[in-house]
Amino acid sequence: MTVPAFTVVIPARLASTRLPDKPLADIGGRPMIVRVAERAHASSAQRTVVATDAPAVAQACAAHGIEAVLTRADHPSGTDRLSEVAAQLGLADDAIVVNVQGDEPLIEPSLIDEVALHLAHHADCAIATAAHPLQDIAEVFNPNVVKVVCDAAGRALYFSRAPIPWARDAWSGVPAVPAALAQVPLPGMPVLRHIGLYAYRAGFLRRFPTLAAAPLEQTEALEQLRAMWHGERIAVLQTSAAPAPGVDTPADLERVRALWAQSMAQEGP
């Protein structure tokens, strides 16, 4: 697999309502944002940059040899922040930028490479992302789990918090929010869970802030729908398994800390 040249950008904000100062949370003796950057460094990325509006995050990165750039604090979305960074770095329009979330300290470097490669193989798309089949019916009906449906070429048709596609026959008589999920079967075709990892062409990132917010984006609270509303194509890489868990809450943080310690113990001295 020959991976194209690409840059990883990791947005990081301190203003988390569920887990304050999340990027600076300790995981194995280092801030979480540093652990994420280390995973990105282990990919084939030519450059890894943390994008933050918080000097404390930039200082933590500098202390561990991680490149960081300060951005404006008023960006309405993470993609808008990436747009500013693409301009700051002077990236060419055809350069590939992979957006790795700042709360994914266990992300597989190989997945980062695969998403960058997927975009390189889809010249008709401005964006690439990833998805995996769901095996838990509770996640299918969970609005916090974003689903995606694709066309025959693997391009996204729609992203939604609703259970899509709706299995008319398998779910006949099932209410939109069933009370007894254990009794609801999985549909015959896979329900794909969206993985929040994106590869962009830098030219698209420059255009993104000029695109008007879309009604579907606002209804679902999914910013990728803005790109689709304005006619951009998104290539979806289908993986066989779910990625490692991210960190949204204090409970997530404890789980990731335990998984980190376990992985270090398995590697040995």
From Swiss-Prot:
Its main location: cytoplasm. The keyword Iron does not apply. It holds the Pfam family CTP_transf_3. Keywords: Cytoplasm, Lipopolysaccharide biosynthesis, Nucleotidyltransferase, Transferase. One of its GO terms (molecular function) is 3-deoxy-manno-octulosonate cytidylyltransferase activity. It catalyses: 3-deoxy-alpha-D-manno-oct-2-ulosonate + CTP = CMP-3-deoxy-beta-D-manno-octulosonate + diphosphate. This is 3-deoxy-manno-octulosonate cytidylyltransferase. It comes from Cupriavidus necator (strain ATCC 17699 / DSM 428 / KCTC 22496 / NCIMB 10442 / H16 / Stanier 337). The gene is kdsB.
